[in-house]
From Swiss-Prot:
UniProt keyword terms in alphabetical order: Calcium, Capsid protein, Disulfide bond, Glycoprotein, Host endoplasmic reticulum, Host-virus interaction, Metal-binding, Outer capsid protein, Signal, T=13 icosahedral capsid protein, Virion
Places the protein is found: Virion; Host endoplasmic reticulum lumen
Sites where a glycan is attached: 69, 241
Annotated region (LVD motif), positions in chain: 237-239
Subunit description: Homotrimer; disulfide-linked. 2 Ca(2+) ions bound at each subunit interface in the trimer hold the trimer together. Interacts with the intermediate capsid protein VP6. Interacts with the outer capsid protein VP5*.
PTM notes: N-glycosylated. The N-terminus is blocked possibly by pyroglutamic acid.
GO molecular function: metal ion binding
Name under which the protein is recorded: Outer capsid glycoprotein VP7
Organism lineage: Viruses, Riboviria, Orthornavirae, Duplornaviricota, Resentoviricetes
Chain intervals for the UniProt region annotation (GPR motif): 253-255
Length: 326
Protein backbone atom coordinates (compact mmCIF):
# COMPACT_ATOMS: atom_id res chain seq x y z
CA UNK A 1 0.00 0.00 0.00
CA UNK A 2 2.62 2.45 1.12
CA UNK A 3 4.96 1.22 -1.63
CA UNK A 4 2.45 2.18 -4.33
CA UNK A 5 2.04 5.70 -2.92
CA UNK A 6 5.80 6.21 -2.70
CA UNK A 7 6.18 5.02 -6.30
CA UNK A 8 3.50 7.48 -7.52
CA UNK A 9 5.14 10.39 -5.71
CA UNK A 10 8.56 9.41 -7.05
CA UNK A 11 7.24 9.23 -10.63
CA UNK A 12 5.65 12.69 -10.25
CA UNK A 13 8.91 14.18 -9.02
CA UNK A 14 10.82 12.60 -11.89
CA UNK A 15 8.27 14.01 -14.38
CA UNK A 16 8.58 17.52 -12.91
CA UNK A 17 12.37 17.38 -13.06
CA UNK A 18 12.24 16.12 -16.65
CA UNK A 19 9.83 18.88 -17.77
CA UNK A 20 11.98 21.50 -16.07
CA UNK A 21 15.05 20.22 -17.90
CA UNK A 22 13.23 20.23 -21.25
CA UNK A 23 11.96 23.81 -20.76
CA UNK A 24 15.41 25.06 -19.84
CA UNK A 25 16.88 23.36 -22.90
CA UNK A 26 14.27 24.92 -25.21
CA UNK A 27 14.86 28.33 -23.63
CA UNK A 28 18.61 28.09 -24.20
CA UNK A 29 18.09 27.10 -27.84
CA UNK A 30 15.64 29.97 -28.48
CA UNK A 31 17.94 32.48 -26.80
CA UNK A 32 20.79 31.26 -28.98
CA UNK A 33 18.72 31.63 -32.17
CA UNK A 34 17.36 35.08 -31.27
CA UNK A 35 20.72 36.50 -30.23
CA UNK A 36 22.45 35.18 -33.34
CA UNK A 37 19.68 36.62 -35.55
CA UNK A 38 19.93 40.05 -33.89
CA UNK A 39 23.71 39.92 -34.17
CA UNK A 40 23.48 39.25 -37.92
CA UNK A 41 20.95 42.09 -38.38
CA UNK A 42 23.21 44.57 -36.57
CA UNK A 43 26.26 43.56 -38.61
CA UNK A 44 24.36 43.80 -41.92
CA UNK A 45 22.84 47.20 -41.04
CA UNK A 46 26.27 48.59 -40.18
CA UNK A 47 27.80 47.38 -43.43
CA UNK A 48 24.94 48.22 -45.80
CA UNK A 49 24.66 51.70 -47.34
CA UNK A 50 21.40 51.36 -49.26
CA UNK A 51 19.35 54.51 -50.02
CA UNK A 52 15.75 54.89 -48.91
CA UNK A 53 14.26 55.52 -52.34
CA UNK A 54 10.93 56.50 -50.84
CA UNK A 55 12.30 59.66 -49.29
CA UNK A 56 12.17 61.73 -52.49
CA UNK A 57 8.83 60.49 -53.78
CA UNK A 58 5.95 63.00 -53.83
CA UNK A 59 3.28 62.34 -51.24
CA UNK A 60 -0.07 61.34 -52.76
CA UNK A 61 -2.03 60.34 -49.67
CA UNK A 62 -4.43 62.44 -47.60
CA UNK A 63 -2.56 65.22 -45.88
CA UNK A 64 -3.50 68.55 -44.34
CA UNK A 65 -0.10 70.14 -43.84
CA UNK A 66 2.21 71.57 -46.48
CA UNK A 67 4.72 69.06 -47.86
CA UNK A 68 8.35 70.11 -48.01
CA UNK A 69 10.99 67.95 -49.67
CA UNK A 70 13.90 68.48 -47.30
CA UNK A 71 16.26 66.19 -49.22
CA UNK A 72 15.98 67.83 -52.63
CA UNK A 73 16.64 71.48 -53.46
CA UNK A 74 14.79 71.08 -56.79
CA UNK A 75 11.26 70.01 -55.83
CA UNK A 76 9.96 70.79 -59.34
CA UNK A 77 11.65 67.62 -60.61
CA UNK A 78 9.13 65.50 -58.69
CA UNK A 79 6.11 67.81 -59.01
CA UNK A 80 3.29 68.30 -61.47
CA UNK A 81 1.98 71.66 -62.62
CA UNK A 82 -1.46 72.26 -64.13
CA UNK A 83 -2.27 75.39 -66.13
CA UNK A 84 -6.00 76.08 -66.59
CA UNK A 85 -6.84 78.46 -69.42
CA UNK A 86 -10.01 79.57 -71.27
CA UNK A 87 -10.85 78.47 -74.80
CA UNK A 88 -10.34 82.03 -76.00
CA UNK A 89 -6.63 81.62 -75.25
CA UNK A 90 -6.09 78.69 -77.64
CA UNK A 91 -8.13 80.51 -80.28
CA UNK A 92 -5.94 83.60 -79.93
CA UNK A 93 -2.69 81.61 -80.00
CA UNK A 94 -3.73 80.06 -83.33
CA UNK A 95 -0.97 77.45 -83.20
CA UNK A 96 -1.78 73.72 -82.99
CA UNK A 97 1.65 73.05 -81.43
CA UNK A 98 1.57 75.84 -78.84
CA UNK A 99 1.46 73.46 -75.85
CA UNK A 100 4.71 71.81 -76.90
CA UNK A 101 6.30 75.22 -77.38
CA UNK A 102 5.28 76.43 -73.93
CA UNK A 103 6.34 73.11 -72.35
CA UNK A 104 9.83 73.55 -73.77
CA UNK A 105 9.93 77.06 -72.35
CA UNK A 106 8.96 75.68 -68.94
CA UNK A 107 11.87 73.26 -69.31
CA UNK A 108 14.25 76.24 -69.25
CA UNK A 109 12.85 77.10 -65.81
CA UNK A 110 13.48 73.64 -64.38
CA UNK A 111 10.16 71.94 -65.17
CA UNK A 112 10.80 68.67 -67.06
CA UNK A 113 8.82 67.76 -70.16
CA UNK A 114 5.72 65.85 -69.09
CA UNK A 115 5.42 67.58 -65.72
CA UNK A 116 3.30 70.49 -67.02
CA UNK A 117 -0.33 69.87 -68.03
CA UNK A 118 -2.61 72.26 -69.92
CA UNK A 119 -6.33 72.07 -69.17
CA UNK A 120 -8.84 74.07 -71.20
CA UNK A 121 -12.20 75.35 -69.94
CA UNK A 122 -14.89 77.06 -71.99
CA UNK A 123 -15.51 80.07 -69.77
CA UNK A 124 -15.72 81.11 -66.13
CA UNK A 125 -19.38 80.15 -65.82
CA UNK A 126 -18.87 76.63 -67.18
CA UNK A 127 -15.69 76.09 -65.15
CA UNK A 128 -17.63 77.01 -61.99
CA UNK A 129 -19.96 74.03 -62.38
CA UNK A 130 -17.29 71.36 -62.16
CA UNK A 131 -13.85 72.65 -61.16
CA UNK A 132 -11.21 69.92 -61.00
CA UNK A 133 -7.71 70.55 -59.69
CA UNK A 134 -5.49 67.48 -59.40
CA UNK A 135 -1.86 68.59 -59.79
CA UNK A 136 0.71 69.33 -57.08
CA UNK A 137 0.55 72.98 -58.19
CA UNK A 138 -2.47 74.46 -59.97
CA UNK A 139 -2.54 77.86 -61.70
CA UNK A 140 -5.88 79.12 -63.03
CA UNK A 141 -5.80 81.86 -65.68
CA UNK A 142 -8.92 84.07 -65.70
CA UNK A 143 -9.39 86.74 -68.33
CA UNK A 144 -10.94 89.79 -66.72
CA UNK A 145 -14.42 90.75 -67.93
CA UNK A 146 -16.18 93.66 -66.27
CA UNK A 147 -19.55 91.90 -66.38
CA UNK A 148 -18.07 88.75 -64.78
CA UNK A 149 -16.40 90.31 -61.75
CA UNK A 150 -18.75 88.60 -59.28
CA UNK A 151 -18.40 85.22 -60.98
CA UNK A 152 -14.61 85.52 -61.00
CA UNK A 153 -14.53 86.58 -57.35
CA UNK A 154 -16.72 83.69 -56.21
CA UNK A 155 -14.80 81.13 -58.26
CA UNK A 156 -11.50 82.41 -56.87
CA UNK A 157 -12.89 82.19 -53.34
CA UNK A 158 -13.93 78.59 -54.00
CA UNK A 159 -10.59 77.56 -55.51
CA UNK A 160 -8.24 79.38 -53.14
CA UNK A 161 -9.81 77.98 -49.98
CA UNK A 162 -10.65 74.57 -48.55
CA UNK A 163 -14.27 73.93 -47.59
CA UNK A 164 -16.05 71.33 -45.46
CA UNK A 165 -19.60 70.93 -46.78
CA UNK A 166 -22.77 68.99 -46.00
CA UNK A 167 -26.00 68.57 -48.00
CA UNK A 168 -28.97 70.83 -47.28
CA UNK A 169 -32.63 69.83 -47.48
CA UNK A 170 -34.25 73.23 -47.93
CA UNK A 171 -37.72 71.74 -48.38
CA UNK A 172 -37.83 70.40 -44.82
CA UNK A 173 -35.50 72.49 -42.68
CA UNK A 174 -34.57 76.05 -41.81
CA UNK A 175 -30.88 76.96 -41.84
CA UNK A 176 -28.70 79.62 -40.26
CA UNK A 177 -25.07 80.61 -40.67
CA UNK A 178 -23.01 80.53 -37.49
CA UNK A 179 -20.13 82.83 -38.40
CA UNK A 180 -18.31 84.54 -41.27
CA UNK A 181 -16.64 81.28 -42.35
CA UNK A 182 -20.04 79.62 -42.80
CA UNK A 183 -21.46 79.99 -46.34
CA UNK A 184 -24.04 78.28 -48.54
CA UNK A 185 -22.49 77.22 -51.83
CA UNK A 186 -24.65 76.39 -54.84
CA UNK A 187 -23.53 74.83 -58.13
CA UNK A 188 -25.44 73.89 -61.25
CA UNK A 189 -26.44 74.84 -64.75
CA UNK A 190 -28.90 77.40 -63.38
CA UNK A 191 -29.09 78.44 -59.73
CA UNK A 192 -31.75 80.84 -58.49
CA UNK A 193 -31.57 81.35 -54.72
CA UNK A 194 -34.23 83.04 -52.59
CA UNK A 195 -34.15 83.49 -48.81
CA UNK A 196 -36.65 84.43 -46.12
CA UNK A 197 -35.18 85.43 -42.72
CA UNK A 198 -37.16 84.25 -39.68
CA UNK A 199 -37.72 85.69 -36.22
CA UNK A 200 -37.62 83.68 -32.99
CA UNK A 201 -41.22 82.54 -33.61
CA UNK A 202 -40.14 81.23 -37.08
CA UNK A 203 -42.28 83.88 -38.76
CA UNK A 204 -40.91 85.53 -41.86
CA UNK A 205 -39.23 88.92 -41.52
CA UNK A 206 -40.59 90.87 -44.49
CA UNK A 207 -41.75 87.67 -46.20
CA UNK A 208 -44.20 84.78 -45.86
CA UNK A 209 -42.73 81.30 -45.35
CA UNK A 210 -45.62 79.84 -47.35
CA UNK A 211 -45.15 82.16 -50.33
CA UNK A 212 -41.79 81.85 -52.10
CA UNK A 213 -42.61 84.81 -54.31
CA UNK A 214 -42.25 87.01 -51.22
CA UNK A 215 -38.71 85.71 -50.53
CA UNK A 216 -35.70 87.93 -51.17
CA UNK A 217 -33.78 86.95 -54.32
CA UNK A 218 -30.00 86.74 -53.86
CA UNK A 219 -29.04 85.01 -57.14
CA UNK A 220 -30.69 84.46 -60.52
CA UNK A 221 -29.61 81.87 -63.12
CA UNK A 222 -26.05 81.60 -61.80
CA UNK A 223 -23.62 78.68 -62.22
CA UNK A 224 -21.89 79.22 -58.89
CA UNK A 225 -23.34 81.08 -55.91
CA UNK A 226 -21.70 81.65 -52.53
CA UNK A 227 -24.54 82.94 -50.36
CA UNK A 228 -23.78 85.00 -47.25
CA UNK A 229 -26.66 85.98 -44.94
CA UNK A 230 -26.95 87.47 -41.45
CA UNK A 231 -25.24 85.17 -38.95
CA UNK A 232 -27.35 83.61 -36.19
CA UNK A 233 -30.67 84.16 -37.99
CA UNK A 234 -32.66 81.19 -39.28
CA UNK A 235 -33.66 81.30 -42.95
CA UNK A 236 -36.14 79.50 -45.15
CA UNK A 237 -34.63 78.93 -48.60
CA UNK A 238 -36.02 78.37 -52.06
CA UNK A 239 -33.62 76.82 -54.56
CA UNK A 240 -34.08 75.60 -58.14
CA UNK A 241 -33.34 72.00 -57.11
CA UNK A 242 -33.72 70.54 -60.60
CA UNK A 243 -30.72 72.38 -62.02
CA UNK A 244 -28.82 73.31 -58.85
CA UNK A 245 -27.42 71.76 -55.68
CA UNK A 246 -26.79 73.68 -52.47
CA UNK A 247 -24.47 72.79 -49.59
CA UNK A 248 -23.86 74.18 -46.11
CA UNK A 249 -20.12 74.89 -46.06
CA UNK A 250 -17.45 75.95 -43.60
CA UNK A 251 -14.28 77.61 -44.83
CA UNK A 252 -11.36 75.71 -43.28
CA UNK A 253 -8.44 77.76 -44.55
CA UNK A 254 -6.35 78.45 -47.65
CA UNK A 255 -5.83 75.85 -50.38
CA UNK A 256 -2.16 76.61 -50.78
CA UNK A 257 -1.45 74.61 -53.93
CA UNK A 258 -3.71 76.86 -56.04
CA UNK A 259 -3.00 80.30 -57.50
CA UNK A 260 -5.31 82.46 -59.61
CA UNK A 261 -3.85 84.77 -62.24
CA UNK A 262 -6.18 87.52 -63.38
CA UNK A 263 -5.51 88.51 -66.97
CA UNK A 264 -6.13 92.24 -67.38
CA UNK A 265 -8.30 94.57 -65.32
CA UNK A 266 -7.30 97.65 -63.37
CA UNK A 267 -7.11 95.97 -59.96
CA UNK A 268 -6.95 92.49 -58.51
CA UNK A 269 -10.39 91.25 -57.48
CA UNK A 270 -11.16 91.19 -53.77
CA UNK A 271 -12.42 87.74 -52.79
CA UNK A 272 -13.12 88.58 -49.14
CA UNK A 273 -16.69 89.21 -48.01
CA UNK A 274 -15.60 91.36 -45.05
CA UNK A 275 -16.19 95.02 -46.10
CA UNK A 276 -13.95 96.41 -43.34
CA UNK A 277 -10.71 95.05 -44.79
CA UNK A 278 -8.87 95.17 -48.09
CA UNK A 279 -6.81 91.97 -47.96
CA UNK A 280 -4.29 90.87 -50.54
CA UNK A 281 -3.61 87.18 -50.91
CA UNK A 282 -0.26 86.30 -52.48
CA UNK A 283 -1.88 83.56 -54.55
CA UNK A 284 -4.25 86.00 -56.29
CA UNK A 285 -2.24 87.96 -58.84
CA UNK A 286 -2.64 89.92 -62.07
CA UNK A 287 -0.77 90.28 -65.36
CA UNK A 288 -1.34 92.96 -67.97
CA UNK A 289 -3.61 91.95 -70.82
CA UNK A 290 -1.90 91.98 -74.18
CA UNK A 291 -1.93 88.90 -76.38
CA UNK A 292 -2.13 85.36 -75.04
CA UNK A 293 1.38 84.57 -76.24
CA UNK A 294 2.58 87.45 -74.07
CA UNK A 295 0.53 86.09 -71.15
CA UNK A 296 2.12 82.63 -71.36
CA UNK A 297 5.60 84.12 -71.75
CA UNK A 298 4.99 86.08 -68.54
CA UNK A 299 3.72 83.00 -66.70
CA UNK A 300 6.79 81.02 -67.76
CA UNK A 301 9.10 83.84 -66.72
CA UNK A 302 7.60 84.11 -63.23
CA UNK A 303 6.55 80.48 -62.68
CA UNK A 304 9.13 79.76 -59.99
CA UNK A 305 8.30 82.95 -58.08
CA UNK A 306 4.61 82.05 -58.26
CA UNK A 307 5.23 78.52 -56.99
CA UNK A 308 7.32 79.81 -54.08
CA UNK A 309 4.24 81.50 -52.56
CA UNK A 310 2.36 78.19 -52.85
CA UNK A 311 2.69 74.91 -50.97
CA UNK A 312 2.67 71.47 -52.51
CA UNK A 313 -0.30 69.60 -51.10
CA UNK A 314 -1.96 66.29 -51.84
CA UNK A 315 -5.60 67.28 -51.53
CA UNK A 316 -7.31 67.53 -54.92
CA UNK A 317 -10.52 69.31 -55.83
CA UNK A 318 -13.43 67.94 -57.80
CA UNK A 319 -17.14 68.64 -57.63
CA UNK A 320 -17.89 65.47 -55.66
CA UNK A 321 -15.14 65.77 -53.05
CA UNK A 322 -15.78 69.49 -52.69
CA UNK A 323 -19.20 68.90 -51.21
CA UNK A 324 -17.81 67.03 -48.24
CA UNK A 325 -14.17 67.89 -47.83
CA UNK A 326 -11.72 69.72 -50.02
Amino acid sequence: MYGIEYTTILNSLILVVLLNYILKSVTRVMDYIIYRFLFVIVIVSLCAKAQNYGINLPITGSMDGAYTNTTDDKPFLTSTLCIYYPTIASNDLADPDWKNTVSQLFLTKGWPMGSVYFNEYVNIAEFSINPQLFCDYNIVLMKYESDLEMDMSELADLLLNEWLCNPMDVTLYYYQQTDEANKWISMGTSCTIKVCPLNTQTLGIGCLTTDTSSFETVAVNEKLVITDVVDGVSHKLDVTNVTCTIRNCKKLGPRENVAVVQIGGANILDITADPTTAPQTERMMRVNWKKWWQVFYTIVDYINQIVKVMSKRSRSLNSAAFYYRV
